[in-house]
Structure formats: structure tokens, C-alpha cells
Amino acid sequence: MKQTTFENFLKRLHGLTPDQTAILMQSVQDMTAQSAAQTAIDTTAGEGVCPHCGSSHRQKWGRTRTDAQRYRCSTCNKTFNGRTGSSIAHLQRLDLFYRVLEDMFGAVAPSSVRHLARQLGVNKDTVWRWRQIILRSLSQSITPLSGIVEVDETFVRESRKGSREWVRHEADPINHPKPPCLRWYEYKLLGVLKERGLNKWQLPVMTAIDRSGNRYAERLPDRKDLTIIQSLSPLICPDAALCSDFYPAYAKFAKTIGMSHVVLGTKPGSRKINQTFHIQNVNALHSRLKAFLRPFKGPSTKYVDGYVNWHFARNQSNAEQSFHNILRMSLQAVSVGTSP
């Protein structure tokens, strides 16, 4: 657009009604998201290889109808762009997908699926599927923890939302046995008291953090000694000083690795040693994690790892970086599958 035409366009904006202004702002927001997403796609395509054969020899081959840069492989003669072979290859509304990313990794708390769907004008199931695409692409980078390392576990209640195990049992009780857990409304209906404290329905989430701010969290299947040792062994440097509570598995892990171990109590006066050894940082991490999970009303157990990774990624990346990661991880998986 020429400068004079653009200036005339700006002058005419003063005559817009409030409703027209809102529509204009929405259009600008959509175009901005589309442009940012397209830039990320072109950047990723320029860094990657052919998703069909894995060759790095390619040439530019025009643009797609969505104005994405298309490439042609010089080895297999097939064309591709930055989304080919990725988990968002067939996504129609790339601008709305990018706005879901902005909501998930913005400065404010993420919106609920229903609220975000109303904002974007799409079905709630669409937003839910897009979120799952994003969560599956998230992973924690394992940085070895050194110095004083605080280790503890927090617990989340097992949730079988979406499993449909009771529906299958009632439809075919012979082939589908009765699920071990009651439905939520049956506790009050049958007068069954919920178990208090730690029980078999509480799933452990192992967390570790050092004084440099490096941290890691992982949902464990149980609290057995071998499970905890296998989880912590590749994570903590042997010359680190381990701070934990009195749970025996930590002592066995420290003895196995040969590292120093400081055991802290739960009573006042025993929670700190010389104002240096404590587990207050990891407890604060538990508090922030549970505050993040609380609005979701207990995510399903099979998605807990994704929500934990989401919580950590919110403090480490923004929407643009996350979009790059989704494309890069998807294309890496494709290139591994096509490599000889």
C-alpha cells in the first residue's frame, strides 16, 4: 500500500463506530497471529530437511495458497513446506492456533477451554485438540542438578476423566470388569467416605531443584526405592549435596551414588540446618504447581505429565518459541522415521 493511501486509510478510522472498531481490532489481531505463525513456519523450513527422504538439498519452489514458502527436494523431487509432516500439517486456522499458543504461554493465567473457544468462535473440542497437540510437543530439558539439590515429591489425585470405563462396564460387564474406583457422585450417594492422607489414589510427582534455579519434575508410577533411584540417577551430579525429608528412598539413593545427604525433619527447629540446608525452594515449587493445576479441576492422569511440562514451559518460553518447538520436534520425528 502506498504511503498516501495508508494515511488516508488512517484518517478514515476516526469515523468508525465502536462495533466497527472492535471488528477492526479483531481482524488486526488475527492477521498479526497469522503473520507470526507463517514467519515461524518459514524459519523452521529453512533450517530443516526434506520430510520425505531426509535430504538437505532443496530449492525454493513458489509459495502455497496460504503464502508459505514451498520447497522442492533435489533428491526425491517432492515438494514440501514448513508444516509438511508435522502435527499441524493439516491445520486450517493457523491464526487461531497461534492465539491458543499465546493464551497458553502469555503473562496472565490461561483461559478455560470453553472461554477461549467463545473468544475464537470455534468449538470447544477444537481448542481441546489444539491444546493436546501443544502439550504433546512439550518436554523438559534435563540439565544436571549440582551444588545443593532439594528433592521432594508432591501428590496429585488420580483422575480417570474421559476413560469411559464405567460406560463400557455397564454395556458389557462380562468383557469389561468393574472399575476399581467409584464415580465422584457415588461417594455421597452411597455414603462412602473418601480416604484421607496418602492412599493408592494419590500419584507422586517427583520434583528436584538446585540453588541455580535448574529444576525438574516427573510423575512416577509409585514411591518404590528402585523407581526413585532410577528417576534421580541421571538427574543429579554425584558431587552434589542432597537435601530431603526422612523418606528412606532418598537415603538409599545417596548411598548408591555416594553423595552427601542432609535429612531434614518436619518439626519446628529441624526444617533448616545453618540456614543453608532446607527444602523450602522445592516446597514453593509444589505450591506454584498446584496453584497452576487448580483451575483445571484435576486433569486426567494420562495428561498430568503434559500439564507439568506446560507449567515449566510457561516460565521459559513465549508463544513464538513454543510454536518453533512444536514444528521442530514434529519434523525431527519425521526425519528420524525417514532416515536410512
Where are these regions (language model features)?
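Residue-level recognition of single "structural anchor" positions
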Residues: 1-340
